Amino acid sequence: MMRKSVRRAMLMTTACVSLLLASVPLCAQANDVQQKLAALEKSSGGRLGVALINTADNTQTLYRADERFAMCSTSKVMAVAAVLKQSETQKGLLSQRVEIKPSDLINYNPIAEKHVNGTMTFGELSAAALQYSDNTAMNKLIAHLGGPDKVTAFARTIGDDTFRLDRTEPTLNTAIPGDPRDTTTPLAMAQALRNLTLGNALGDTQRAQLVMWLKGNTTGAASIQAGLPTSWVVGDKTGSGGYGTTNDIAVIWPEGRAPLVLVTYFTQSEPKAESRRDVLAAAARIVTDGY
């Protein structure tokens, strides 16, 4: 209990560091956000991790942001980004075709299953992985890159020393408590997502393509997006796995303001616990209130 209290106090302090030159009411507001996230976590019965970066002034709102969580399908962003990076020097890569065999299909293949005994381009595989969370598409991208460790290696090249991908679909979604495989921290993922979509980790064309794919996601309406004003533009990637693990990572464009980058990770203690997208929506609502 004391360890949890100390951790929360540290996180509250972190939230206020960026407000050192601001007024006491602003720091009190940051503490209020921490208290609301703690209350949400307690009522949910799980473990919640949140990292919000306001790109207007680089302030951060953090909750368990340095703890590891299973990424599940949010890892697809890094795999797709690695392929996009290759396409900067391998012209025509996204148009190259890959055979889709019946044996390639696994547990969730909404797009790939339509192309069995046919082919898909790397561009189509990337879109399927990001916008429909197609697991066969993800495995094809990982195989092309040379294995999960190559995705991790790419993360290192963009300054992310925390991300680790150890397995392929669907086993990367086991999300066993305490298992470091296929995990990252909310803050590390938020920083990586910012670098990929708003920074210089990718070339202009590749960055624009990644953002377009994320904005076209079909799986996120009930997660982060559900906690935001309808006028805000969202590009996101969801993920889910064992132990009721429910994730969403997003770049958010509030109307008339600088983008926000938000990562929400949530997991539970029971292996067959239900997903809780409502928790992610509530967390998004809490941390963006007042923007």
Swiss-Prot record:
Keyword vocabulary terms for this entry: Antibiotic resistance, Hydrolase, Plasmid, Secreted, Signal
Reaction it catalyzes: a beta-lactam + H2O = a substituted beta-amino acid
Known role: Extended-spectrum beta-lactamase (ESBL) which confers resistance to penicillins, as well as first, second and third-generation cephalosporins. Has cefotaxime-hydrolyzing activity. Inactive against cephalosporin antibiotic, cefoxitin, and the carbapenem, imipenem.
Gene3D superfamilies: DD-peptidase/beta-lactamase superfamily
Keyword Ribonucleoprotein carried by entry: no
Signal among keywords: yes
Name of the protein described by the UniProt record: Beta-lactamase CTX-M-25
Organism: Escherichia coli
Extent of the signal sequence: 1-30
